[in-house]
Amino acid sequence: MKNLYSNHKTGKKIFLFLQLFFLLGMLYTANAQVMVPFTQRTSQYTPTKKIYNVKGDFTMLGNTNLTLQSYSNTSPNNNNTMVYVDVDGNSIAGLGGSPTFNSSAATLSLSTENGAVPSCSRIIYAGLYWTGRADQSGTASNTFSVTKTINGTSYTKNFDKRKIMFKGPGAANYTQFLASTSDIYYPTSTGDYIYSSYVEVTDYVRQYGVGEYLAADMALRDGNGGGTGYSGGWGLIVVYENSKMKYRDVTLFDGHAYIVSSNTTPFDLPVSGFNTVQTGNVGVKLGMMASEGDVSLTGDYFSIRNLATTNYTNLSHSGNTATNFFNSSINTGGNNRNPNLQNNTGIDISMFTLPNTNNSIIGNSQTSTNFRYGTAGDTYAIFSIAMSVDAYIPEPEGVLSATNINGIPVTAPYTATPGQDITFKVDIKNLGTEAVNNTKIIIPVPYNATYVAGSASGSVFFTPLPTPNNVYFDSTLGSTGSIVWDFGTLPLPASP
């Protein structure tokens, strides 16, 4: 481990302060078709935290709760008869205590990057989203009733678009979650009746961990939903950390943007506040949830601005194309789903790595970018977007210790009397994943101590020497002055 040493004398023990500065930008968007403006989603436990700076990442999972009565990989949900997906075997009570009408499952898996053990990862945040279209005309309500016969018995459920039943790995029963009226969008006649809902489930996912999750009894209708069609499904976003993994800046944001097929105007979504690595390749991962993108209708796209130009690159992943981005595909890293359908009839959940060859899209030390989305033929609604970038997170460590009092070597605990000189040593180490630039240590002198003029010095035990590598006393910094060591770049150690 490389060390940097500074020695100075005062009449009292001095404490080390390493000042790090971060500026986090705000996310915003504005256009005529955004029913609910996109804002950064924060946890109820850390409401001011806009960016998750973690050794870790985010992941996504989810599924559809409606499918075609006559399933086909290429048929859309519009003007077709839809039926409930129900995979839990009617053995577990759902909404209202009766067997579930609709249910589907997906498995939460966490990364094994750099030898990370998923069971040792810590859940930082989990957010549950669900979406559906259950109305065609008139004035829609958040609640409605559906009657269904199961094993010869008739049941009636009073569905609520704000309610969902959720079941974690090993849980005996479903737990009901209720979204706030402001999370996210519940139209009565606009936006093609597509609703989107959200609730934080961090505590629940921490309790049950990795494994299969089921979501059931969403407010959905089966049957023929007309020209747009009925659809419905759910998705879970999880932010987690593991000490083995890379540093990343993770940003989550949601809203409700409705894009109608007749409007070909593109719309922009600026994102700022992350801070990418200073050198080397920048890894970028994107996640998204949307509703009503059809497999058979093309022309819809989602793009990102190139770093060096004002041009945009249309994005795609293994389950879609650049000219049919919203195509009812669920592409979340290969985790298990039940059912595991190619055509999810109006539900898109995507998680994929962006093509960033030679850092052409996101570069080193970049703090903002811009997304653009639009259509030339398909109608859809976006309600959740996630992004992670390889991050620059300085992780220096400073250890302050006294070496002698009045020239006599000492070890802790120390005892000094007024008038004695105390010599301190500051050990600085870089525990991060890359060099720390513009490093400066500022040590305020306590009000009851006096700096011994000319006593501060610095020794560097690596090559090449950093610049400016200057140790000095600044009498104007603080009420009694401060000792400053401005030595420039703190490199990575040769052996951590």
Indicate residue ranges for each PLM-predicted region:
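Solvent-exposed, conformationally flexible loop/turn segments
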Residues: S261-T264, G419, P493-P496
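Bacterial Sec-dependent N-terminal signal peptides
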Residues: M1-M35
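Polar/charged side chains located within well-ordered beta-strands of beta-rich proteins
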Residues: Q19, T369, G398-A402, F424, ...
